[in-house]
Amino acid sequence: MSKNDDILLFSLSNSHQLANKIANLLKIELSPIRIDKFADGELIVAPQVPVRGRRVIIIQSTSKPVNDSLMELLIAIDSIKRASAKAISVVIPYYGYARQDRKAKPREPITARLVAKMIESAGATSVLTWDIHSLQTQGFFDIPFDSLEAVWVLMKHYFSAYKDSSNITIVSPDYGGVKRAREISIATGATLAIVDKRRSGKNQVEINNVLGDVKDRDCVIVDDMIDTGGTILGAAKIVREKGAKSITIIATHGLFNNNARQHFQQAIKDRIINKICIADTIENEPFDGLEIVSIAPAIAKCIEIYSEGTGSMSFVHDENSKVLFAKKIY
């Protein structure tokens, strides 16, 4: 019996492309699942093969349409649990609602915790996600929860084009991303710069200054996601004004909300940005200057660890990041 014979892999509506890549790497077929919507908008999701006694993997990003994607996931978990699956592992490449992880103002909800409890109550036995916005979300779960860092996969892709890091500067677009940028800077030997950003209102960003030298440098602005793009575009503009030689945007999740795609395309045409590199946690149509790097191999490795019942998910992180630390990428 193959080590993957006990696994059933289901893809929901938001992650078909990624799930197909994972299935091909694991050399297994995606199992059929029915996803229908009634006239009133209600969803029905049900596996079309027996799942009794099997280990089940469900792949679904809870990105746009966020609420439909989340309900589809919850109903899928519930239907599979009621069909007597042995275990249900949920792979959520992009975890929606993670930014609502605290009460920023009086009377606001902590929706990240609510979503965690809904996933648990539906019947999930473990959760795997990538570059979750706030690591404290893992504390909202009472089941095994792993958030791995796809940013290392993206950094390996970027650095593969360079012989060394002598002219590269890692740029954090705000103070919230300094820890991530510093880790990459230390790992690669690149220098570090920080954009001094102040938020003046909802989706309103005021850029003040750059801390660190970016003049004539190949700059990499690193963030966990591209939402409306205001923060990253503002950072890119001031870094370019300060004399950067090139600017690459690296972000795990490409949400591209509102008119972000058009704004980034224009920024590339205007040579403010040279290119953008994202992971395929969310399905995106490519455009000139956008590179999409797949995390399917990393997820497939996680599923193999899960199916074998030995090892650690942190191995997948180490497998990507240790190459940078050892500087074997050059």
UniProtKB/Swiss-Prot annotation:
Binding of Mg(2+) 1, residues: 133
Residues where ATP binds: 40-42, 99-100
Binding site for Mg(2+) 2: 174
GO-annotated cellular components: cytoplasm; ribose phosphate diphosphokinase complex
Entry note: cofactor: Binds 2 Mg(2+) ions per subunit.
InterPro entries noted in UniProt: PRib_PP_synth_CS, Pribosyltran_N, PRibTrfase_dom, PRTase-like, Rib-P_diPkinase, Rib-P_diPkinase_bac
Domain of life of the organism encoding this protein: Bacteria
Pathway: Metabolic intermediate biosynthesis; 5-phospho-alpha-D-ribose 1-diphosphate biosynthesis; 5-phospho-alpha-D-ribose 1-diphosphate from D-ribose 5-phosphate (route I): step 1/1
Quaternary organization: Homohexamer.
Protein name listed in UniProt: Ribose-phosphate pyrophosphokinase
